Amino acid sequence: MAEELVLERCDLELEANGRDHHTADLCRERLVVRRGQPFWLTLHFEGRNYEASVDSLTFCAVTGPDPSEEAGTKALFRLSDATEEGAWAAVAADQRDSTLSLHLSTPANAPVGHYRLSLEASTGYQGSSFMLGQFTLLFNSWCPADAVYLDSDEERQEYVLTQQGFIYQGSAKFIKNIPWNFGQFEEGILDICLMLLDVNPKFLRNAGRDCSRRSSPVYVGRVVSGMVNCNDDQGVLLGRWDNNYADGISPMSWIGSVDILRRWKRDGCQRVKYGQCWVFAAVACTVLRCLGIPTRVVTNYNSAHDQNSNLLIEYFRNEFGEIQSDKSEMIWNFHCWVESWMTRPDLQPGYEGWQALDPTPQEKSEGTYCCGPVPVRAIKEGDLSTKYDAPFVFAEVNADVVDWIRQDDGSLHKSINHSLVVGLKISTKCVGRDDREDITHSYKYPEGSPEEREAFTRANHLNKLVNKEETGVAMRIRVGEGMNRGCDFDVFAHITNSTPEEHTGRLLLCARTVSYNGILGPECGTKDLLSLSLEPYSEKSIPLRILYEKYCDCLTESNLIKVRGLLIEPAANSYLLAERDIYLENPEIKIRILGEPKQNRKLVAEISLQNPLTVALSGCTFTVEGAGLIEEQKTVDVPDPVEAGEEVKVRVDLLPLYVGRHKLVVNFESDRLKAVKGFRNVIVGPS
């Protein structure tokens, strides 16, 4: 009788598997592989090697607390001669001395998560069980059979592997790129992402069913959308929009997801204070990329928050044009969400591809504060019956806006406002470049096209099909040069009379600070022209001077000022409204890299900023992050005040761990100048 087969050890071949599965950054101390693609194992036996004629090897892979073959969370499979498509399999690849090298294959629809792998070796009537190790299984956008497959290597690099990028803020007429450190492969982040799945309410209610459903990126995306906010659960971030962040961190101060996720884990899954839309979106992007789902952050300018699903945002204003209506339905200056790439077998053909997911807690979906995934194509087509939450996302990019002026006697007059169009300049970072890509066309057909009319008809969006009222008099807000924080500047109400008649009216100009979500602050400039005459076929530009001393104490960290012009013509009973959001530029953060960037060789970054204000800055700090360049976030305090016009300079030590292109991301804070962002690309060569 043959001697019993005894396993001495199992080599999980971390280096080779990490290279083959694009998980090298995760495979330093553990095995992380992607589903639907074989990975290597080497079995080392004591005494003798495996003999096919006398030995039987049966493998068992399980995930979750209650694994079962029926749920797809347990797999039993024997060593065989060939792989079977769509099934777990083990195939011998090489045999020498007392070692046996294997290819282990996983189905392209296996649940993602943490697995335990064991072996039962039988020789005749003898048998022994051995624990081979543990591994983590991720979605695989390189595998054609996987629901997240992308056929472009450049897109896989950008949307799965790239650890830094940009989030777009500012305004539709002044788009500002904000650098962000996603850091999905940084130390401990994968474990945190898996923990996030394991504390979601669906797992707590029925762990076996939840783990089974993790085979679907649609399901996982929806769970992540709900878990990034903490409104229903032990989610990551608490949202706050009132500019009172003293007991936490201002949403504008974050520069990456890593610090947020680590804080959440460190504090026992307690909510991190505070987030706003781009922070929710960026953290969701980190989690989804880490799990292997191609994902990008998207910004929509002039984004509607339509609560009652009538695709209409109504503003009620007093006779001076000031909004007096409820703030629950608003036009946000911009709003961020994410798109993830996946098939939709639960929907009709044609709805695969980019899916919108919005983790910012706004409205409940099936009892939970989450939104999506909904096919971007369904939004474009006006197919509002499509899962999930199509009406809400459709309204964000297509809602109509009506302004009502309420007179002293209570009567309402509809104003003409062509300056505010919902759903503009929908933006994301370009693939492989530090540029902005405009993806508005993927959400909306060209304005006025037959396809747009069909989509609006399908969505029953009748407001958009009504021709806009024209009077022959138009007004828009123009800006001058030098729109920098700390400066005085001019804005202009530019009025055009395209009619053969003279028009006379009253012009009210008002500038107020504003948060990105449309909440107005105090006035910082006004003008009231009681009698303004417009000659036939003429133009006029009326200036409004905005002084730093007026806005310095009330400008929010959004750096936005809303300028409103209201032209009232009593003779024609006409109200012409124009608005524009102005973004004030922060000073530039300059970053110099001292020395040649080489792998595993110390490096110094010199970071500087010039105070643009007329007063000194105190409490100055620089915070630095950069996946692959610096292990943990570093903060450098500046002990002395920085006088007006003076330059402040600090140095930070770096240790690049990986060859390639990385971003060093910087945030500057002080008492009077906050959330100033900067970045520098660093190309690291081999040592």
From Swiss-Prot:
Cofactors (names): Ca(2+)
Catalytic site: C277, H335, D358
Task: List cystine links.
Answer: C230-C370, C370-C371
Per UniProt, which keywords does this protein have? Answer: Acetylation, Acyltransferase, Calcium, Cell membrane, Chromosome, Cytoplasm, Disulfide bond, Extracellular matrix, GTP-binding, Hydrolase, Isopeptide bond, Membrane, Metal-binding, Mitochondrion, Nucleotide-binding, Nucleus, Protease, S-nitrosylation, Secreted, Transferase
Its biological function? Calcium-dependent acyltransferase that catalyzes the formation of covalent bonds between peptide-bound glutamine and various primary amines, such as gamma-amino group of peptide-bound lysine, or mono- and polyamines, thereby producing cross-linked or aminated proteins, respectively. Involved in many biological processes, such as bone development, angiogenesis, wound healing, cellular differentiation, chromatin modification and apoptosis.
Q: In which tissues is it expressed?
A: Highest levels are detected in the lung. Lower levels are found in the liver, spleen and heart, but not in the brain.
According to the record, the protein's activity is controlled as follows: Acyltransferase activity is regulated by the binding of GTP and Ca(2+): inactivated by GTP, which stabilizes its closed structure, thereby obstructing the accessibility of substrates to the active sites. In contrast, Ca(2+) acts as a cofactor by inducing conformational change to the active open form. In absence of Ca(2+), Mg(2+) may bind Ca(2+)-binding sites, promoting GTP-binding and subsequent inhibition of the acyltransferase activity. Extracellularly reduced and activated by CLIC3.
* Protein species of origin: Bos taurus (Bovine)
Q: What is its EC number?
A: 2.3.2.13, 3.4.-.-, 3.5.1.44, 2.3.1.-
In the record, biological process GO terms are: bone development; cellular response to dopamine; cellular response to serotonin; peptide cross-linking; phospholipase C-activating G protein-coupled receptor signaling pathway; positive regulation of apoptotic process; positive regulation of GTPase activity; positive regulation of small GTPase mediated signal transduction
PANTHER family with a match to the protein in the record: PROTEIN-GLUTAMINE GAMMA-GLUTAMYLTRANSFERASE, PROTEIN-GLUTAMINE GAMMA-GLUTAMYLTRANSFERASE 2
Cellular location(s)? Cytoplasm, Cytosol; Nucleus; Chromosome; Secreted, Extracellular space, Extracellular matrix
- Under the GO molecular function aspect, what terms does this record hold? calcium ion binding; GTP binding; histone dopaminyltransferase activity; histone serotonyltransferase activity; peptidase activity; peptide histaminyltransferase activity; peptide noradrenalinyltransferase activity; peptide serotonyltransferase activity
Q: What modifications follow translation? A: Disulfide bond formation inactivates the calcium-dependent acyltransferase activity. Cys-370 can form disulfide bonds with both Cys-230 and Cys-371: formation of a disulfide bond between Cys-230 and Cys-370 facilitates formation of the disulfide between Cys-370 and Cys-371, which promotes inactivation of the acyltransferase activity. May also form interchain disulfids between Cys-230 and Cys-370. Ca(2+) protects against disulfide bond formation and inactivation.
**Positions where N-acetylalanine occurs in the chain:** A2
Query: In this chain's numbering, which residues are marked as the site (Important for catalytic activity)?
Result: Y516
Which residues participate in Ca(2+) binding?
N398, D400, E437, E447, E452, E539
Triggers of expression: By retinoic acid.
Residues in cross-link Isoglutamyl lysine isopeptide (Gln-Lys) (interchain with K-?): Q633
> Which residues are reported to carry the modification N6-acetyllysine?
K468
This protein's name: Protein-glutamine gamma-glutamyltransferase 2
Lineage: superkingdom: Eukaryota
Give me the reactions it catalyses: L-glutaminyl-[protein] + L-lysyl-[protein] = [protein]-L-lysyl-N(6)-5-L-glutamyl-[protein] + NH4(+); L-glutaminyl-[protein] + serotonin = 5-serotonyl-L-glutamyl-[protein] + NH4(+); L-glutaminyl-[protein] + dopamine = 5-dopaminyl-L-glutamyl-[protein] + NH4(+); L-glutaminyl-[protein] + histamine = 5-histaminyl-L-glutamyl-[protein] + NH4(+)
